[in-house]
């Protein structure tokens, strides 16, 4: 019973499934890799990769890996607290807060991460490498580096009101 409740805690989204081959003496051996993003649409999101000989098994492995590495995303009224650029390898993702009602303006893998993080209004642009894994990692990197006003005030030893004056 506990296993079913845990499954409902996070929503899963398969970003890519890729067939990879190992060349051996007798020919090629095929396997599948899966890139999956999981999130609760309430500020927690993670991604994982899995590899197996069958697609469902690869997805299952990826989901387990994603649940082990969750990131908490600070949100302000359904968007990010400030503009940020996430970078990974040669790919970068620029994310900018948007007014309520704008929606998620993002492409493919970036959209999956932002929606499952619970962000409802944001503008984003992916630059450089457009490999799905690089885009997902760059997005997660950017979300990890977000700071809300309370965190900044605490770091500076001031109150939130003092920051805005």
Curated annotation (Swiss-Prot):
Domain of life: Bacteria
Keywords: Ribonucleoprotein, Ribosomal protein, RNA-binding, rRNA-binding
One GO term of the biological process aspect: translation
Keyword Transferase attributed: no
SUPFAM superfamilies noted in UniProt: dsRNA-binding domain-like, Ribosomal protein S5 domain 2-like
InterPro entries according to UniProt: Ribosomal_Su5_D2-typ_SF, Ribosomal_uS5, Ribosomal_uS5_bac-type, Ribosomal_uS5_C, Ribosomal_uS5_N, Ribosomal_uS5_N_CS, Ribsml_uS5_D2-typ_fold_subgr
Cellular-component GO terms for this entry: small ribosomal subunit
Similarity remark: Belongs to the universal ribosomal protein uS5 family.
Function: With S4 and S12 plays an important role in translational accuracy. Located at the back of the 30S subunit body where it stabilizes the conformation of the head with respect to the body.
Protein name: Small ribosomal subunit protein uS5
Lineage: Bacteria, Bacillati, Bacillota, Bacilli, Bacillales
Gene it is expressed from: rpsE
């Amino acid at each position: 019973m506990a296993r079913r409740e845990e499954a409902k805690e996070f929503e899963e989204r398969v970003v890519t499934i890729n067939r990879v081959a190992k060349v051996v003496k007798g020919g090629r051996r095929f396997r599948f890799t899966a890139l999956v993003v999981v999130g609760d649409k309430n500020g927690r999101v993670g991604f994982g990769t899995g590899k197996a000989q069958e697609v469902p098994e690869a997805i299952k492995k990826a989901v387990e890996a994603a649940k082990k590495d969750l990131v908490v995303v600070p949100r302000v009224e359904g968007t990010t607290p400030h503009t940020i650029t996430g970078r990974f390898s040669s790919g970068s993702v620029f994310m900018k807060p948007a007014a309520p009602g704008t929606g998620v303006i993002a492409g493919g893998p970036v959209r999956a991460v932002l929606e499952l993080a619970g962000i409802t209004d944001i503008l984003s642009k992916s630059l450089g490498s457009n490999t799905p894994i690089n885009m997902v990692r760059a997005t997660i990197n950017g979300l990890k580096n977000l700071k809300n006003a309370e965190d900044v005030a605490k770091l500076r030893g001031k109150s939130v009101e003092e920051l805005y004056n």
